[in-house]
Design a protein with these regions (language model features):
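Intrinsically disordered, low-complexity boundary segments flanking structured domains
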Residues: 22-23, 51-57, 79-81
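Arg/Lys-rich, positively charged N-terminal/basic patches that mediate binding to nucleic acids
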Residues: 1-36
Length: 107
């Protein structure tokens, strides 16, 4: 299912993304990931509810979390939200390296 749009959770995250160099491999991977999400909102891996970090539940009030694998062990985290109960919006919450990802999920 195609989402209505893919957005960043807040302006500071979007500024971080826009601040990345055009030749940065992470920015290129994020752009590819966004294009993939625009075609299929469910292209990531769904996190079981009991494994969603409490920090994210408290900070964003979310009830679902998706992980999109990026190259070199990086991960992009996003949530799917309903828009007028018909369309879906994919909201990018963060991207992180594998070490930070493991720390967040307590692996």
């Amino acid at each position: 299912m195609k989402p209505e749009k893919v957005i960043f959770v807040d302006e500071s995250l979007e500024k971080s993304f826009n601040g990345l160099s055009e030749i940065d491999p992470i920015k290129k991977a994020l752009i590819r990931a966004i294009k993939t999400l625009q075609e299929d909102a469910f292209s990531g891996r769904n996190v079981k509810k009991k494994l969603i970090p409490k920090l994210f539940i408290q900070k964003y009030g979310l009830n679902n979390l998706w992980i999109y694998n990026l190259p070199d062990g990086w991960r992009m985290l996003y949530v799917l939200t309903p828009s007028e109960e018909v369309q879906i919006i994919a909201v990018i919450l963060d991207w992180m390296n594998h070490k930070d990802y493991e720390r967040l999920f307590k692996f």
